[in-house]
Amino acid sequence: VDVLSTAERLADEVLFPAALTTDTADAVPVDLLDTLAEAGLYGLSGPISAGGVDADFPTVCSVVEKLASGCLTTTFVWVQHLGAVIAAAGSDNAAIGDWVSPLCRGQRRAGLALGGAIPGRPLLRARETENGWTFTGTSPYVSGWNRVDVIHTAARTDDGRLVWALIDARESATLIVERLTLVALNATATVRADLLEHDVPAQRVTSVGPYREGPVPPEPLRIHAALALGVAMRCCRLLGATPLDEELARVRAELDRLDPATIQAARGSAGEVALRAAAALAVATGSRSLLVGDHAQRLIREALFGLVYALRPGSRDAVLVQLRAAP
């Protein structure tokens, strides 16, 4: 499967034509996610033996960028799934092995809850029990509610271990969600999830290991940047040839180096370029860009999302410098 050609075709022929409708929907249309599954993209990072593509990291980044150029909302719900595939495929827990193929084929779909993995005081705590674990706390942003089957959830123990598990994406007395209203990507159906002594069977645990606080590895920052690059790429295509094309290529090349010393600034640059490209498209479009039926206004809001989503201090500082707003 030529996943790059497939991603480009789906972005141009399926996601982009539906993007304005998706933007105003209550949740991403299921048929769009089904299309990605049928194309094999839910298994992008999964093993071939389980129905995956086993794409290398540069290919994953390119696919994310191409899909994001079609519709950031749909892409964002889908991309949350990829980490669960990698975790399940690499798990030492034999019971998790049964999940790998359904996840790769998109028969089971996963969201992401990072409450226990966020630096500082853990928002989500894990306590070991006779049959597994209980999770208590909050994950402030969980996307894809009612579109995912499980949530790949991180919780931290009092003795400094990080527990990852697949928990059912289903409300209960111990898992309560509150729908959030977003100015961009609202159809991601993002919720705040509160867990109270929520039982997690040992069979659902993908990994348990030491929690290490430190700089974010380059790879997740590169994926975050790919979302913004996709928005910028679509804006550049709608604008036609401009100096922004070369600037976008330079930022992408710097990100591809995965240099720990520059990746945070480069991730910030991706969001800043997307914002300027979207603003340029709005100006070129004129007053039509104020209409909810025009792509320019959607792309400006998506660029805002790409600018601030999961923004780390190093990236934030770099963006403020670029915006000439650094203290």
Model region roles, listed by residue range:
Residues 91-93, 129-130, 156-159, 169-172, ...:
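Short loop segments at secondary-structure junctions
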Residues 108, 120-122, 147-149, 161, ...:
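A generic structural signal for well-ordered coil/turn residues at beta-strand boundaries
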Residues 130-134, 150, 190:
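A generic structural signal for beta-strand entry/edge sites
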Residues 138-171:
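DPxDG-like acidic metal-binding loop motif
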Residues 178-253:
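Glycine-rich beta->alpha junctions and the first turn(s) of the following alpha-helix
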